[in-house]
Amino acid sequence: LVGSEMCIRDRFLDVTGRNDWSSTLAPGNNSYFYPSVSGSVILSDLLHIDTPMVNFLKVRASWANVGNDTSPYQLLNYYNNSSFTGGFNMPTNKANYNLKPENVESWEFGVEGRFFDSRLTFDVAFYNATTTNQIISVPVDITTGVYNTIVNAGEINNRGWEVSARIQPVRNKNIRWDM
């Protein structure tokens, strides 16, 4: 894992890179590199906003690309132990020596704020993640002698909003009420 962080006048940048080697994937497909970059700006400091109404305001963005490998023993066909002593069963899944790592590319944009002496806070973010080269089991014709094979197929996208808010209607030396 290699990373670097930089902060210049209320602007933050974080860059990382990581490479993994997986023993569950074949040589040539077993190494995957995943980088990420994120940045944020504290607008309330940058714009010198120092009022009782606005205490803190930050915008942020990030992008990452990560890999995923498969379960062990998916690359080669092997016999399974039988329920009978000393026996073996034929495999029910056809192995795939050419499996590649899954890939997930994601990004997020967000805003965080605190207002009225931090009595009202919020955090809103939009995220988007796309997974490609999913490692999935697909059915095959039974005449092949197996039921399934493991392949890289499919693409799925997951996106949405994350919202959190807190209000503190009562705060004094004896009581603090958060909602």
Feature locations, PLM:
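Extracellular/periplasmic, surface-exposed regions of secreted and cell-surface proteins
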Residues: S4-E5, R9-M179
